[in-house]
Amino acid sequence: MEIFKPINEKKAKGKVKKIFSEIKKTRKITKIPNFWKSIAHNPPLLERTWNSLKAIMKDGALDAVTKELIYVAVSITNSCGYCTRSHTFAAKKKGATDQMIKEMIDVVGIANQNNKLVEAYQVEVDKIYK
């Protein structure tokens, strides 16, 4: 259960209302997701987070689908169900296929498993990797 009730989009004012409008336009959505409505209790945090997300998630050396898949991978590893679902949705909207998502999940699984094995066995890093 949330700590703070998400801000009602229709009751948003000032900077929050402006950012909500930009989020909807940029993400091509009609309703503000609960994440944004929840952090809107702290308008400077809302603004900073939105600006950072826009800057980082835009196309660059990595395309938008790849960035969304990375976001999903990190969210799975961090056990953030909300972020996993919302960014899987975003990845699909940007062109990710079910097969791409399945393969990414396989990579997350094997990476997490092998990371834990390396730590458990205290494997020394090979000279070639240093």
Give the residues covered by each predicted segment.
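Hydrophobic alpha-helical segments
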Residues: 1-130
